[in-house]
Amino acid sequence: MENAFKLLYKTIEERKESPLPESYTNYLFSKGEDKILKKIGEECAEVIIACKNNDKEEVVKEMVDVFYHCFVLLAEKNIALEDVMREVKERNGKLSRVGDRREIDTL
């Protein structure tokens, strides 16, 4: 799975460095961070709706859209995927207790 993410991120970086006409990825880069963030928000809302509808297939599709748009944001912000993966690996296996988390009381 990690290879699929690496390949997707590499493609996004290539689009950023060498834009292709009619590329949706290039469209997002040309519109900038606000557009990318808006798309992430939209896709997250679609994940929520798919979950509420108990539509597993749609959840999977929408999660891929979330990952894609988050990867575009990472590339826009010049954050390497390896940095994110390193953080995931560092957190993997760590015991986290509910008491260690801040209370979520407002949105």
UniProtKB/Swiss-Prot annotation:
Disulfide bonds: none annotated. GO terms for molecular function: ATP binding; phosphoribosyl-ATP diphosphatase activity. One of its GO terms (cellular component) is cytoplasm. It holds the Pfam family PRA-PH. Pathway: Amino-acid biosynthesis; L-histidine biosynthesis; L-histidine from 5-phospho-alpha-D-ribose 1-diphosphate: step 2/9. Its EC number is 3.6.1.31. One of its GO terms (biological process) is L-histidine biosynthetic process. It catalyses: 1-(5-phospho-beta-D-ribosyl)-ATP + H2O = 1-(5-phospho-beta-D-ribosyl)-5'-AMP + diphosphate + H(+). It comes from the Bacteria. Its main location: cytoplasm. It is found in: Cytoplasm. InterPro entries: HisE (IPR008179), PRib-ATP_PPHydrolase-like (IPR021130). Keywords: Amino-acid biosynthesis, ATP-binding, Cytoplasm, Histidine biosynthesis, Hydrolase, Nucleotide-binding. Belongs to the PRA-PH family. PANTHER family: HISTIDINE BIOSYNTHESIS BIFUNCTIONAL PROTEIN (PTHR42945), HISTIDINE BIOSYNTHESIS BIFUNCTIONAL PROTEIN HISIE (PTHR42945:SF9). HAMAP family: HisE. This is Phosphoribosyl-ATP pyrophosphatase. The gene is hisE.
